[in-house]
Amino acid sequence: MRFMFIVKSAHQGSPTPELLEAMHKLANREIKAGRMLDSGGLMPLATGAQVRITDGQLSVVDGPFVEAKEVIGGYAIFELQGKEEAVASATEFMQLHKDFMPGWEGTCELRAFAGP
């Protein structure tokens, strides 16, 4: 079963070097095991844009976005046995944040892909 992990946080700073190293080790392990298919960190909101439809009209809004309370900082795509394994993987990933970036608060949202 394919899952996307979406990491959200109100924290706007970069990960610590220690957290980056720990995430790199975890990612390498998961890639070698064939579970992690893709992953990436995202640039700050100021570099992005939103294309919206409001009242039937298209508009483009350049970042940063004032209304953003939580920002998607990164994602990963996994091939796992099911939700239980996905929760265990996400818990391990979030534990790295707790261990190597004290005070950081955020969420790792797990979403299964529709279809094969």
Predicted features by range, described:
Residues M1-P116:
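Conserved, structured core segments of small domains
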